[in-house]
A protein has these predicted regions:
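Bacterial N-terminal signal peptides that target proteins for export
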Residues: 2-16
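Boundary at the C-terminal end of the N-terminal hydrophobic targeting segment
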Residues: 28-30
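N-terminal mature ectodomain segment of secretory-pathway/periplasmic proteins
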Residues: 32-117
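Gly/Pro-enriched, hydrophobic low-complexity segments
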Residues: 38, 89, 100, 110-114, ...
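Short amphipathic beta-strand and strand-loop transition segments with alternating hydrophobic
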Residues: 73-76, 154-160, 214-215
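Short solvent-exposed loop/turn micro-motifs enriched in small/polar/acidic residues
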Residues: 79, 94, 105-106, 151, ...
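Surface-exposed beta-loop interaction hotspot
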Residues: 145-151, 158
Length: 266
């Protein structure tokens, strides 16, 4: 009996040690995932403001393309998330439509949509931000900036993607109204630039893949992808954003990102 008791004690000790090791390993992977996310986010620091022209191509499963033109402006807010405004310039049926976004580090983001036909500004409720943005495969949630504090992170592995060594990090949105249960993010090891995101829907199915291409560096520090593609695996559609005429330090102020500025944006 003494030998059996000794064996049970050894098994119990081994079990406790395994649990402690698993906890430590889990914390290390979580911390590494967060560290990678923070380093990636630093690519967006200190740009002050930016502007660009955008082309949005909506491609259905038959390969037919609808093209829209936009102007995009962004303002850095050092103490919180960034502000942005996207204004449609063509075609005629969406001309003047604008979306204003205030990203926040912790609380839910604020978004407003201006519809010129109705001459009114409509606030987008948090629970509706998973819906498609004006017929594209991007959601309203995708059009807001992904602040580091909005997610829990776990480092998964290293993997080669497009001939680039990448970290693969899993992040889970803390927002209960997010359209995603989790996202897998590929971040290159050289510059900590996001290369690809797999988006999983509320049923944990792989809903969309987001690709970031043609990164270019501005003023020696600010990285801007000139192409972002969103592929919807459930409906076979794709949306592509093409960026051009990128400029930093335009002198924008908070006044350029107010609800009244939406009405002046035509």
């Amino acid at each position: 009996m003494k030998g059996l008791s000794h064996l049970k004690n050894k098994q119990f000790t081994a079990l406790v040690m395994a649990m402690i090791l698993a906890s430590i390993t889990g914390n290390l992977f979580a911390n590494k995932g967060l560290e990678i996310a923070i380093l990636s986010d630093k690519n967006n620091d200190d740009f002050i403001d930016s502007s660009s022209s955008m082309t949005m191509n909506l491609i259905n499963k038959r390969g037919e393309v609808v093209t829209r033109k936009l102007r995009f402006k962004r303002l850095e807010v050092p103490t919180d998330g960034d502000k942005s405004i996207a204004i449609f310039e063509s075609p005629r049926d969406v001309k003047g439509v604008a979306i204003l976004s205030y990203a926040h580090k912790v609380k839910a983001d604020d978004q407003w949509l201006y519809l010129p036909a109705l001459k009114r500004v409509k606030r987008i409720a948090s629970k509706n931000k998973s819906g498609p943005f004006l017929g594209s495969e991007f959601s309203f949630e995708d059009f807001s900036f992904q602040e580091v504090e909005k997610y829990d992170y776990v480092y998964l592995k290293e993997e080669i993607y497009q001939e680039k060594p990448c970290y693969v990090v899993e992040r889970k949105p803390l927002d209960p109204y997010s359209g995603y249960t989790k996202q897998l993010v590929w971040i290159d090891k050289e510059n900590y630039l996001v290369q690809k995101i797999h988006h999983f829907d509320r049923k944990s199915f792989h809903l969309k893949t987001q690709l970031f291409k043609d990164y270019r560096k501005y003023e020696g520090f600010f990285w801007q992808p000139h192409e972002i593609e969103m592929i919807n695996h459930q409906n076979g559609k794709r949306s592509i954003l093409l960026f051009d005429d990128v400029k930093l330090k335009n002198g924008f102020t908070d006044r350029d990102f107010s609800q009244n500025s939406l009405k002046r944006s035509r």
